[in-house]
């Protein structure tokens, strides 16, 4: 499978945004995606992950058969679950270490540090059962559920794409009601509603599976689609920017509220957010495709590619670095802009450096271990 450098760059950009967004005192968090789009880096990462799943499935099924593709994503669901469990333990230990050094931080709940020290086995158990999803890692719980469904549902999507899309939409419509029945430590189900976010994830998968059929079919209508997509993105951007102006922009906000209904929830995946990111995906894939390729080939783009290619490992590192960065920016109190900016830059460089090391040493080692296991089997 040929890698798409723009895809890797965007995945890396999403991870950098996620890291900065989780650092409350960050100076650069005011320039992340969420500040000029109605959706944020979490939606971008889930959509791109779905797209990558579709591409990989198609490649593996073509070369090795459907059973191999199903097994690959069943194993991947386990790997994400394992990352959720051990990442949660490690994050709690890091938090406990920071508190022991009298370094306050607000990126994660302090109670995790208490639990991992007082009852590590119990804390491991609630993570392993996914009864508890620590903040910053809670999106992985949804990702586990969605990936676990891939071996069963992707064959259905391939065989009955229209019926699958209709079913996915109906499930999204009832997402808030269904999520309340999911066993969880908090009332109302998982924070990231899997019944809502499946629409975005499987939209990405469909784009990856059928991109060679979809793009040629849509190209005759590219002008209209570009206008509609740009309009949808601009609509969402106007909502976000108008909210920042407060009272002076109240007439504009009231007018916009008549269209979108007054509330745009993230956790159930509001329709406005979904349409905005789908519109943005068309803009990136078609009218801005060459621009994205040039950006991805630049030095900064290559660095973001390396972060994006780190995948799950890079995600865990971005979470841990956001906790450390938050602590460094809070302690001592009253830091100036220059010092907080220095921490932002340190966190981004560290994420890139660790991701590059992983690609150079960690990923090849992981592949060799997997190859030896498959050879013995």
Each predicted region: which residue ranges?
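Alpha-helical transmembrane segments and their immediate juxtamembrane cytosolic regions
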Residues: 1-377
């Amino acid at each position: 499978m040929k890698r798409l450098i723009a895809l890797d760059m965007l995945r890396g950009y999403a991870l950098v945004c996620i890291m900065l967004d989780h650092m409350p005192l960050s100076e650069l968090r005011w320039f992340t995606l969420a500040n000029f789009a109605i959706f944020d880096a979490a939606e971008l990462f889930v959509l791109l992950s779905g797209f990558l799943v579709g591409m990989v499935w198609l490649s593996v099924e073509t070369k090795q058969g459907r059973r191999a593709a199903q097994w690959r994503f069943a194993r991947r669901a386990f790997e994400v679950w394992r990352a959720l469990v051990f990442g949660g333990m490690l994050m709690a230990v890091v938090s406990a270490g920071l508190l022991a050094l009298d370094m306050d931080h607000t990126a994660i709940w302090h109670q995790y540090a208490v639990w991992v020290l007082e009852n590590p086995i119990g804390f491991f158990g609630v993570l392993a059962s996914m009864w508890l999803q620590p903040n910053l890692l809670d999106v992985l719980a949804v990702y586990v559920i969605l990936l676990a469904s891939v071996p069963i549902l992707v064959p259905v999507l391939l065989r009955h794409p229209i019926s699958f899309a209709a079913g996915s939409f109906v499930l999204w419509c009832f997402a808030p009601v269904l999520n309340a029945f999911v066993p969880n430590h908090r009332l109302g189900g998982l924070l990231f509603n899997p019944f809502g976010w499946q629409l975005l994830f499987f939209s990405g998968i469909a784009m990856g599976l059928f991109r060679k059929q979809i793009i040629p079919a849509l190209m005759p209508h590219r002008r209209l689609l570009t206008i509609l997509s740009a309009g949808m993105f601009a609509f969402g951007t106007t909502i976000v920017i108008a909210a920042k102006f407060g009272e002076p922009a109240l007439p504009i906000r009231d007018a916009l509220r008549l269209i979108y209904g007054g509330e745009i929830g993230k956790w159930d995946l509001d329709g406005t957010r979904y349409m905005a990111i789908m519109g943005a995906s068309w803009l990136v894939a078609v009218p801005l495709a060459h621009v994205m390729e040039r950006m991805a080939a630049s030095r900064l783009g290559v660095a973001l590619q390396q972060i994006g290619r780190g995948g799950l490992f890079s995600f865990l590192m971005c979470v841990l670095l956001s906790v450390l960065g938050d602590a460094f920016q809070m302690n001592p109190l009253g830091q100036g802009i220059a010092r907080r900016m220095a921490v932002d830059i340190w966190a981004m460089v560290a994420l890139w450096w660790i991701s590059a090391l992983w690609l150079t040493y960690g990923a090849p080692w992981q592949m060799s271990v997997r190859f030896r296991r498959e050879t013995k089997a």
